[in-house]
Amino acid sequence: MNPARRCSALLSQLCVTSRGGSTARRPLSPGPVSALGGTRCCRSGVGGGGAGVKETCPQPRPSGASTTGTAPVCPMGRSSSRLFGTFAQSLNRAPLAQPAPYPEENPDQDLAQTDPDQLLRECEEALQRRPARPHRHLVYPSGTASRRHKHNPAIRIMQWNILAQALGEGKDGFIRCPMDALNWQERKYLIMEEILTYRPDILCLQEVDHYYDTFQPVLASLGYHGSFLAKPWSPCLDVERNNGPDGCALFYRRSRFSLQATAYLRLSAMMLPTNQVAIVQTLICRETGQRLCVAVTHLKARSGWERMRSAQGADLLRSLRGITSQRSSGQTEAAPGAVPLVVCGDFNAEPSEDVYRRFSSSALGLNSAYKLLSADGQTEPAYTTWKIRPSGESCSTLDYIWYTQGALSVDCLLDIPTEEQIGPDRLPSYHYPSDHLSLLCDISFRDEPHRLM
């Protein structure tokens, strides 16, 4: 049997259970059938909620889920149109039913821990008949050498739109990518191999539609705490064979951080709710005791929606100003933006768009990390996504890691693969699992930040 078509014993064990009800899915061979977790409730805050926390967002449960063979199906009617993808439908449809809340996180601590080296070897074994992923290098801005801080170690952050499985197979139309290359039983290994190769301390993902059956159990066993927020009306649910809604996920390594507060945001535009979301968490670094606010988001896609993306970005920035101004215990007051901030996301916006200018000129003092790869330190990469669809070839810079430049410094970044490495068929492909490239940087707290925390 082709090893790329079997699930390793370890990975299949990790994908067996999660909290809540179960839904049948394609059986793994060998190994037990995985169970999808039930829906989760969005909470307005954890431990230290407060300013900047938006309305709670219901987590949709696939209603009337049925099975075709053994793959989950969430029927959404006979329509083959672009359901849930427009502003008007977000406004006109009634909100999804509010699920019963779950107890606060986290049962992850009870899971047996997995050796990441062993899991990486199993991924490599399962992928041995596929071409190798593009080899990428860590680049140190301005020729600075690698720095190691004994009492202030670097924090590795990864940003990645991993491509929702339902969209890759059913809607996105990657005409130069063979359907076999998008097979989830193979593609999940490529995604996990990328994560395990770089082992981020903080992982921000978009288009996650296999959170409960894959990413949450696997990453929890590797020592991560995970949070997930689905889009209110995910386009994945318009695909006949789907695994539930897609959304944003945020993971952090429990050995490095403790959680102070969480905000689940449904972004608004012109005071009206939209279909895009964000997760914002305030973390406490165990080594230094310093706080770090991390946000993950995914703004409205497609050309023609620039004004909505700008409004969504403005709404997110307002929330972040409130959240990063929250006082910690013992403080009498806090200045706006007092907590250092990292914002990761697929903004679906080129640097020429207004939403990019909003972030770069924000009072929060944000800078885009990947500008530091350029010779002048002011130019974004030529692309973070490169795909071919029926409408043509698209090579764009849409993904960003923003950071508070007065309080944080970027030590190194993962370079961008060349056109030759990506290949003539572009992304996704047999050797890369998504149409978006992962972004990764090491950051550290400045010894003397411009603003006290």
Task: Name what the model sees in each region.
Residues V277-I284, R291-A295, R307-G345, A349:
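His/acidic metal-ligating clusters that form di-metal
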Residues N2-T144, D201, Y211, R321-V342, ...:
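Metal-dependent phosphoester-hydrolase catalytic domains
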Residues E104-A154, I202-A301, W305, S394, ...:
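Structured beta-strand-rich core segments of catalytic domains in phosphoester-bond hydrolases
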Residues I157-M158, V343:
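Residue-level marker for buried hydrophobic side chains located in beta-strands
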Residues I162-Q185, C236, M270-M271, S303:
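Acidic/histidine-rich helix-loop elements
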Residues K188, E193-V208:
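Proline-aspartate-enriched helix->loop->beta-strand connector
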Residues W184-K188, R309:
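A conditional alpha-helix N-cap/helix-loop micro-motif detector
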